[in-house]
Amino acid sequence: MNPALFSNELEYLYTGQGFGEAFEFLYESFESRLSEPQPEGDAEELRIDKLRKDLVFMWRSRLYSDIRISLTGTFSSTPHEDTTAVFASHRFILVSRSPYFYNALVSWAKPKPQQANEPITLSLPSPPFTPASLHFTLGFLYTGTLIFSSTPYDLNTAFAILRSATYLSLDTLYDEIQARIIQEMMHGLFHTFLSFAEYERLTSSKWGTGGCRCRQCARRAPRVLEFAVAHDVRNPYLERGARRALISLFGEGWCTSEFAALPQKLRESLLKGVGKHMTVENVFPLLFAAEHALIKLNPVNDAWGDTVREMIESGRRALDEVLCNQAEACFMQLEWLEIMENDGARFEDGEKAEWIMEAILRGMNDKNCAILYQVRATTI
């Protein structure tokens, strides 16, 4: 075999460029050769897309497969029963795309096939790998992207993919799945890539702004936070964004079993984070959020409801103190002025005024009662 020719063939196999263009010309239809030439950028994208599809076909059809990867763990619906999942793959893809597989197949002692003429089998640990995460990880190795398939993956699988990327030293896969968790699954995760100073400047230090507070984010944020602080993950971006989200979700956003399931130390740190936002400017929005949460928790009889109720009431007590100790400044805020100007015309104004009066009664003490009396006479 001509070495130069073989080198060109390998270049095309790996990159989709070079040698193969001659064959593409020979096998293209006469009509396609007469068509208008496409811009270089589009042509490049088409070549890459074609290469991806060819490699995925080769992988899924097991064409020329020369290696197997096995996982053993409790994957089935039957608890405490180990099962084994086996994936067919190609040595040249694994070695060229992953430092871990390069070491396993080239540098370390070579595993031997169980029988003659059988491909060798590599075993991977579970955890961190699961059948779903390994499927997407292998797909990424073949295509360079996680969108090689229309099959979706859930948040747990995304977590497993990130752990798999760490295990295999795949920085590009790590970055992609991290970005997809943040942007697609958590709707931006409260601008997690911004520093504290940049985020405060963006939100003007107003609580509850700067990110998505939908029901999906409220249920997923506790899971993202617990995952991010795990000893084998320690992801600063996921942790920072999840903390921002949960602090901004104080109130009804905490009324989930997922939040109650967080370790107590994490829940206390989040309440402390809310406390840092208990400023004069934020006192009324936070107080209203706490009251709405307590109303939502009224029909909840499960144990998790008691856990959340205790957290909300603890936060509300701190808000009562801020309101009573800084009453003069608080009652100059827009939320109160709007209630007074509308003269109770809006249905919710009466309810909010009642919540504020109850907060004053709870927070009043010997030290602030004189100030509260003066404010009541001039403002309330």
Question: What is each model feature region?
Answer:
Residues 2-91, 95, 139-158, 163, ...:
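N-terminal BTB/POZ boundary and linker segment
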Residues 5, 9, 18, 22-31, ...:
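Alpha-helical protein-protein interaction/assembly modules
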Residues 14, 18, 98-99, 106, ...:
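Short amphipathic alpha-helices and their capping/turn residues within compact interaction modules
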Residues 58-61, 78-79, 83-85, 126-127, ...:
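A general structural signal for short secondary-structure junctions and capping/turn motifs
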Residues 123-124, 136:
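Extended alpha-helical solenoid/arm regions of large eukaryotic scaffolding proteins
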Residues 131-134, 158:
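Structural signal for repeat-unit boundaries in curved repeat scaffolds
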